[in-house]
Amino acid sequence: MEKMSRQLPLNPTFIPPPYGVLRSLLENPLKLPLHPEDAFSKDRDKGKKLDDGSNSPTVPQSAFLGPTLWDKTLPYDGDTFQLEYMDLEEFLSENGIPPSPSQHDHSPHPPGLQPASSTAPSVMDLSSRATAPLHPGIPSPNCMQNPIRPGQLLPANRNTPSPIDPDTIQVPVGYEPDPADLALSSIPGPEMFDPRKRKFSEEELKPQPMIKKARKVFIPDDLKDDKYWARRRKNNMAAKRSRDARRLKENQIAIRASFLEKENSALRQEVADLRKELGKCKNILAKYEARHGPL
């Protein structure tokens, strides 16, 4: 069945003036009724009143009594005319207008009592909105530029670790030197020799040459005076101090070498364990690359 289209009759009270349609619409706005039946009944009543009344039509006037915008003349002077900067966010917040319709729909507060923080989005919100895709099915440009391969995990922290001082590393070594050897390797005093911290310079570790004894010179008894015996005692004390210092240094080097041997064996065992663990990791990585491709 074909639906009969019925045309609405024009309002006979509306007479377009000769000076423009836009101005006439602004001055004389039309109000369309909600129900077409009421419009037909009102048009019939108005037609009867117009037939009974005078033939001169009356132009309806606008309800606004103030001056119209086009009747005003703004003073313009090229020297004094200046443009003022206006912040859009501030203007919207002062007038209680939300910057986006989503905030206006979901805001529980009235427009005049909205906090300023809700009307001005932060930089983080703008960055998140820029990175988020417009539609759920369309990926963002950043995802297209940096594709994530299957199985690839992004590290939570990319910062490189701070450098470690090798001297601060403590290797667990089960080494306990003999207290008697420590006493022979320590200088008389409160501080004891520590083979874990004591380091020797290259000069101290150089091989010492063999000291040859000087050939004895025979001196008759009548020439052995007090000056001779004083010089003899002085030389003997210097030789004794030299022997004690050399023996002390040899004992320290021996205890230090014993500790380094223990530490070397512990480090070798640790390196062997690390190599075994590295071999397992390489095997797992090779199996993963064979199944999913290279990383």
Swiss-Prot record:
Q: Which SUPFAM superfamilies match?
A: Leucine zipper domain
Q: Which residues form the signal peptide?
A: none
Q: Which Pfam families match?
A: bZIP_2
Q: Which PROSITE patterns match?
A: BZIP
Q: What induces it?
A: Accumulates according to a robust circadian rhythm.
Q: Where is this region: Disordered?
A: 34-69, 93-160
Q: Where in the cell is it found?
A: Nucleus
Q: Give TM segment ranges.
A: none
Where the protein is mainly located, per its record? Answer: nucleus
User: Has UniProt tagged this entry with the keyword Transcription regulation?
Assistant: yes
Give any single GO term for biological process.
Answer: rhythmic process
Keywords annotated in UniProt: Biological rhythms, DNA-binding, Nucleus, Transcription, Transcription regulation
Question: Which residue ranges does the record assign to the bZIP domain?
Answer: 225-288
- Output a single Gene Ontology CC term carried by this record: nucleus
Is Membrane one of the keywords?
Answer: no
Please list where the region (Leucine-zipper) is annotated: 248-255
* Spans annotated as Basic motif: 227-247
Q: In which tissues is it expressed?
A: Isoform HLF43 is abundant in brain, liver and kidney. Isoform HLF36 is expressed only in the liver. Both isoforms accumulate in the liver with different circadian amplitudes. Isoform HLF36 reaches peak expression levels between 8 and 12 p.m. Isoform HLF43 displays a more pronounced fluctuation through the day.
Cross-referenced Gene3D superfamilies: 1.20.5.170
UniProt lists compositionally biased (Basic and acidic residues) regions at: 34-52
Which InterPro entries does this one have?
Answer: bZIP, bZIP_sf, PAR_bZIP
Report the GO molecular function annotations.
DNA-binding transcription activator activity, RNA polymerase II-specific; DNA-binding transcription factor activity, RNA polymerase II-specific; RNA polymerase II cis-regulatory region sequence-specific DNA binding; sequence-specific DNA binding; sequence-specific double-stranded DNA binding
Assembly with partners or alone: Binds DNA specifically as homodimer or heterodimer with other PAR factors.
Which family does this protein fall into? Belongs to the bZIP family. PAR subfamily.
Please report the name of this protein according to its UniProt entry: Hepatic leukemia factor
Which gene does this sequence derive from? Hlf
